[in-house]
Amino acid sequence: MSWQDKINAALDARRAADALRRRYPVAQGAGRWLVADDRQYLNFSSNDYLGLSHHPQIIRAWKLGAEQFGVGSGGSGHVSGYSVAHQVLEEELAEWLGYSRALLFISGFAANQAVIAAMMAKEDRIVADRLSHASLLEAASLSPSPLRRFAHNDVTHLARLLASPCPGQQLVVTEGVFSMDGDSAPLEEIQQVTQQHDGWLMVDDAHGTGVIGEQGRGSCWLQKVKPELLVVTFGKGFGVSGAAVLCSNTVADYLLQFARHLIYSTSMPPAQAQALRASLAVIRSDEGDARREKLVSLIARFRAGVQDLPFTLADSCSAIQPLIVGDNSRALQLAEKLRQQGCWVTAIRPPTVPAGTARLRLTLTAAHEMQDIDRLLEVLHGND
């Protein structure tokens, strides 16, 4: 089989399963409205949970940062790309979340890959929730450490896996809020079991940070858990992009030596770090509290109005509200019908989610209004 035959076969298989991914160029993709092809849609696909991507205070901080520092960092943080803007942001993040150190990364994917690659060796073992994000599971699969998966949020299964002999160290990996189902991990129980077996816990809280907990401190703070490794990302609650790893001083020093994604990548622009500082200030403020409270109200309105639809509503209290349709083609058809009626919704299909669980992944944000939720419910009820 030639290279072209191999590529064509893979694409044909995706098409046959109604699982071929496509991109849509949009003029605006974050916030309340999505604009594409000169048409405006209510946007129920964005991860901009607090509606901060268009916040004037954050935009102004980025502009001023660009004027002060330029539009790029100029290099890796190990060469010339670590600015005072990066340093101050790291210090503010560490203070906010109660850690000794924070290290910035260009994306959550890079942060997860870097940490697992740097921390794990052949004699160690990774034990991950089976529904963990692709960045975590791919990093674990590429690691020299064996990977064991425990049933989703099943602490008893986790304990059994941890109890089996391991010559090295054990790292338990999970998410705070799961990206495709919107449910939360029982972090307190997971940490307790992990500690009983002398393991370390790594939590990716991409979808909880900024959105839940006191001052938006996220899932771990809400559940009174402090994992050894906490990954937070800035493309969701913060409304920007990038990520950080929160850890101890010793672990931070170690990652600075061995985390290749950090060492060999150009740092995020200092102007972006300034925008993230402004976003953090909003998240921690009374305005941040008001946005989170509004989001909770919108979620409650949606869940109350969708109960009688002939789809499975995931057990989620988060901004992620999946409607499980099951069949790939049915999910695609529903998403298209909703778009035709002014609601931009994304159909998520295998391999992103397990086979037979294709869904409409609906995301609500503080930028929405109650009438937007009512319109979404009206359209959903008209297409059931």
Curated annotation (Swiss-Prot):
The keyword Transferase applies. It is an enzyme of class 2 (transferase). GO terms for molecular function: 8-amino-7-oxononanoate synthase activity; pyridoxal phosphate binding. Its EC number is 2.3.1.47. It comes from the Bacteria. Its cofactor is pyridoxal 5'-phosphate. Gene3D superfamilies: Aspartate Aminotransferase, domain 1 (3.90.1150.10), Type I PLP-dependent aspartate aminotransferase-like (Major domain) (3.40.640.10). Pfam families: Aminotran_1_2. Catalyzes the decarboxylative condensation of pimeloyl-[acyl-carrier protein] and L-alanine to produce 8-amino-7-oxononanoate (AON), [acyl-carrier protein], and carbon dioxide. This is 8-amino-7-oxononanoate synthase. It comes from Escherichia coli O7:K1 (strain IAI39 / ExPEC). The gene is bioF.
